[in-house]
């Protein structure tokens, strides 16, 4: 999407900074594009294992050739290429965090959550080439959002959409009718598949879409 491309291009201009994007705008997709265009070892810090799983799925979909490791709980197998790190695994007092210095880029997902003292200390002492923070809102009720620019850098780009993720649909009138007094789905499916006018309409829509893409 064009707004995603604009956000990626803007963020690539800076070595550090925050990307503000509402839910549904595809922050992970944009981050994957940034990873693809910066050929440096990258650590993605996420606040939960659930997000770690989502990141794994996104990386597998958009960057299938990239080696992905994970550092969370008992699962500590790093690839040194792109590694997903849970915040809890590096924010405890006894956590080993030296390995983070090997990365050229740190991406902090949901960066507004870095107010935890342990995680803040870890990130504040990192000396990396690129630091990217991503969040839907850079504000915290406890006032600790003032730390975000010190850790991730200033806000570099804000995605502003009236309705994030909006998709417009066109309804085509097929003139199909189903006269049976009882609704029996298998019979309805059969009748739909046999309707010549509807089938021709579908074929025309597909043909026009293919021509638009060519």
Residue locations for each model-derived region?
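Conserved RecA-like ASCE P-loop NTPase motor core of nucleic-acid helicases/translocases
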Residues: 41-48, 213-214
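Conserved interdomain hinge at the start of the Helicase C-terminal
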Residues: 34, 180-214
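N-terminal pre-P-loop "Q-motif" helix
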Residues: 1-15
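Conserved helix-turn-beta segment of the N-terminal RecA-like "Helicase ATP-binding" lobe
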Residues: 45, 49-74
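Walker A/P-loop
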Residues: 13-35
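Post-DEXD/H (motif II) to motif III coupling segment of the RecA-like Helicase ATP-binding lobe
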Residues: 104-105, 112-170
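Conserved helix/coil segment N-terminal to the catalytic DExD/H
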Residues: 72-105, 116-121
